[in-house]
């Protein structure tokens, strides 16, 4: 039988959210353990190591707001790549002295709550010690919103004899693509970065597209240490971090123009779009007119502007209509809008072909390649599946987590749809919290900013409960219903609600179609969390363990002693 380990709090995941929460609870005096599937910190930035992988959030917001970290760290680029993010997170682990609190190579497989002592028993597999069991009062899941890859059920997928893998399973040691025949299936955010990078070195690249990708210019720049040192010394960096975290809609340092679309002339509208386009990044979506979100006419105008600008860069007339059709095929922004550096130019290369899967769907995979309706067999040496993720809920429901009735989380949400309070807790799973998941700002926010907002709330809640002697915290079904109504109401106000995709889970066959992100923006989200805390956590049912006589005559004590120390897992 596996040995039992006891801690106050267990954090699952050593990415941005897990490391941040582990540090905060450690600093608060709790005995906290973080477990991570990978052999090092990084979260999704460990697994996503494909060529060109980098953030979509512009410097300085994609980092922790902790000034002690910012002081001694400088970035090399406006949009850092995965290697640099890995180094940054390792730096945070060292700076925060977290190594003794993290167990790597550990996969959590299941968890159940014990009503007798208000603790979770969590089971998993450790690479060195085999099966492990951990007991904790507080169970915190920081798994990332896009950490469960999705691969469509292609006919004959396993027949292909060469390397074939999902973009998030890119070999850590890399793979030599020089001169080889490569296929990329998909044109989402990961595919954009892969295609524009490998097209310069492969012998031949064939891209399989189902839906046009509304990729926008990144406007990448190098950053000098001198610029960053001055930015920090002036106080502007700290001000930017506070502003984006507490005042901006999605945690990005951009904001909409104050004027309405219909107040401007056509020339003024064009000038607003042009200015945003030149700045790049999120500006076309988040610094033009708010009506891009809630007015179909304005949204379609934004699409057409994007299409016209993108088509100027595509030489092949046929490819123009496939990659950037003038008429919107879905709401602009209704699917993720990744940032590119020379994505569209890649299709001007003689060694790059494009197959429109709407006109010529994939029929099957074969030993030597992929068979499509019109082209027949195309032979490849390597196939890359950039086919997306089961976002928001996939990682959570992959773990065998039982509620107080013994029902699995995946079954609860398949019956009722996703039910949460603030996108962080769900009823009948007491003392369990999750970050950057369903019904939170998640996909419409800057990850580190969202994680810190949520983490601050959970930390304060836990410390408040410890101070009051509360041992069981469970959100109410009434609070869940209100939050779900808020999620639905907000989503239905915007033109995105007409678009099928991972924002609603419709990229996964059989998954219930519903909005998986709360679209109210950071200021409103923070206000809701603050009101809950200041109101005494009325959205939660609070209970304490019964007191029993102390056999050593020290008065009344909890029925089960509070754990104050623990040995490392496997010790």
Swiss-Prot record:
The residues that the entry says bind NADP(+) are 54-56, 187-193, 210-211
Describe how the cofactor binds: Binds 1 FAD per subunit.
Residues given in the record as FAD binding sites: 44-47, 56-57, 62
Q: Which residues of this protein are annotated with the site description Transition state stabilizer? A: 336
The keyword Flavoprotein belongs to this UniProt entry's keyword annotation: yes
MF terms in GO = flavin adenine dinucleotide binding; monooxygenase activity; N,N-dimethylaniline monooxygenase activity; NADP binding; polyketide synthase activity
| GO biological process: one example | (M)-viriditoxin biosynthetic process
Mutant phenotype after disruption: Impairs the conversion of the ketone group into a methyl-ester group to yield semi-viriditoxin.
Pathway involvement?
Secondary metabolite biosynthesis
Q: Keyword check for Oxidoreductase, yes or no.
A: yes
Spell out the disulfide connections.
none
Q: Which reaction does it catalyse?
A: 9,10-dihydroxy-7-methoxy-3-(2-oxopropyl)-1H-benzo[g]isochromen-1-one + NADPH + O2 + H(+) = methyl 2-[(3S)-9,10-dihydroxy-7-methoxy-1-oxo-1H,3H,4H-naphtho[2,3-c]pyran-3-yl]acetate + NADP(+) + H2O; (3S)-9,10-dihydroxy-7-methoxy-3-(2-oxopropyl)-1H,3H,4H-naphtho[2,3-c]pyran-1-one + NADPH + O2 + H(+) = semiviriditoxin + NADP(+) + H2O
Q: What cofactor requirement does the entry state?
A: FAD
**Looking at its record, which EC class is this enzyme?**
oxidoreductase
Give the E.C. number(s).
Answer: 1.14.13.-
Looking up InterPro entries in the UniProt record yields: FAD-binding_Monooxygenases, FAD/NAD-bd_sf, Flavin_mOase-like
Keywords for this protein: FAD, Flavoprotein, Monooxygenase, NADP, Oxidoreductase
Give the protein's biological function: FAD-binding monooxygenase; part of the gene cluster that mediates the biosynthesis of viriditoxin, one of the 'classical' secondary metabolites produced by fungi and that has antibacterial activity. The first step is performed by the polyketide synthase VdtA which condenses one acetyl-CoA and 6 malonyl-CoA units to form the heptaketide monomer backbone of viriditoxin. The product of VdtA is then O-methylated on C7 by the O-methyltransferase VdtC. The O-methyl group is important for the stereoselective coupling of the monomers at the final step of viriditoxin biosynthesis.
Family to which the UniProt record says this protein belongs = Belongs to the FAD-binding monooxygenase family.
Give the protein name, as stated in the record: FAD-binding monooxygenase VdtE
Source lineage: Eukaryota, Fungi, Dikarya, Ascomycota, Pezizomycotina
């Amino acid at each position: 039988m596996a040995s039992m380990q006891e801690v106050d709090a267990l954090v699952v995941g050593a990415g941005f959210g897990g490391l941040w929460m582990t540090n905060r609870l450690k600093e608060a005096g709790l005995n906290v353990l973080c477990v991570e599937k990978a052999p090092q910190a990084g979260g999704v930035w460990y697994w996503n190591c494909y060529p060109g992988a980098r953030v979509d959030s512009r410097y300085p917001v994609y980092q922790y707001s902790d000034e002690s970290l910012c002081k001694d760290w400088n970035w090399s680029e406006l949009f850092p790549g995965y290697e640099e993010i890995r180094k940054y997170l390792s730096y945070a682990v060292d700076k925060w002295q977290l190594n003794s609190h993290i167990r790597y190579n550990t996969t959590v497989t299941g968890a159940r709550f014990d009503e007798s002592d208000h603790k979770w028993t969590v089971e998993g597999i450790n690479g060195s010690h085999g099966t492990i069991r951990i007991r904790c009062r507080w169970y915190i899941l920081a798994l990332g919103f896009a950490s469960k890859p999705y691969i469509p059920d292609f006919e004959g997928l396993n027949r292909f004899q060469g390397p074939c893998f999902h973009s998030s399973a890119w070999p850590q040691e890399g793979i030599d693509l020089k001169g080889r025949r490569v296929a990329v299936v998909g044109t989402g955010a990961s595919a954009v970065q892969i295609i524009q990078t490998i097209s310069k070195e492969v012998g031949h690249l064939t891209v399989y597209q189902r839906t046009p990708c509304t990729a926008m210019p990144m406007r990448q720049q190098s950053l000098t240490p001198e610029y960053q040192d001055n930015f920090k010394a002036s106080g502007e960096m700290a001000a930017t971090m506070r502003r984006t975290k507490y005042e901006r809609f999605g945690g990005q340092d951009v904001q909409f123009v104050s004027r309405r679309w219909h107040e401007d002339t056509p020339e003024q509208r064009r000038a607003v779009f042009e200015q945003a386009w030149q700045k790049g990044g999120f500006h076309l979506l988040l610094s033009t007119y708010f009506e891009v979100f809630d007015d179909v006419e304005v949204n379609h105008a934004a699409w057409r502007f994007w299409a016209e600008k993108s088509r100027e860069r595509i030489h092949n007339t046929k490819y123009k209509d496939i990659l950037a059709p003038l008429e919107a095929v879905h709401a602009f922004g209704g699917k993720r809008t990744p940032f590119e550096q020379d994505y569209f130019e890649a299709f001007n290369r003689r060694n790059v072909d494009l197959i429109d899967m709407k006109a010529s769907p994939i029929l099957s995979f074969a030993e030597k390649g992929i068979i499509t309706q019109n082209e027949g067999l195309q032979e490849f040496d390597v196939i890359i599946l950039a086919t997306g993720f089961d976002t928001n809920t996939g990682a959570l429901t992959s773990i065998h987590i039982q509620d107080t009735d013994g029902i699995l989380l995946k079954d609860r949400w398949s019956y009722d749809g996703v039910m949460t309070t603030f996108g962080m807790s769900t009823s009948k799973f007491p003392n369990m919290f999750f970050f950057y998941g369903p019904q939170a700002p998640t996909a419409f926010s800057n990850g580190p900013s969202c994680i810190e907002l949520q983490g601050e709330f959970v930390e304060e809640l836990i410390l408040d409960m410890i101070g009051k002697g509360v041992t069981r915290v469970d959100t109410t079904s009434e609070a869940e219903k209100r939050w779900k109504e808020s999620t639905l109401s907000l989503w239905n106000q915007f033109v995105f609600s007409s678009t099928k995709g991972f924002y609603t889970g419709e990229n996964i066959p059989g998954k219930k179609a519903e909005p998986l992100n709360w679209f109210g923006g950071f200021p409103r989200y923070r206000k809701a969390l603050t009101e809950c805390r200041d109101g005494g956590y009325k959205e939660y049912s609070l209970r304490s363990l019964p007191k029993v006589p102390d056999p050593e005559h020290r008065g009344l004590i909890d029925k089960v002693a509070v754990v104050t120390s623990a040995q490392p897992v496997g010790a």
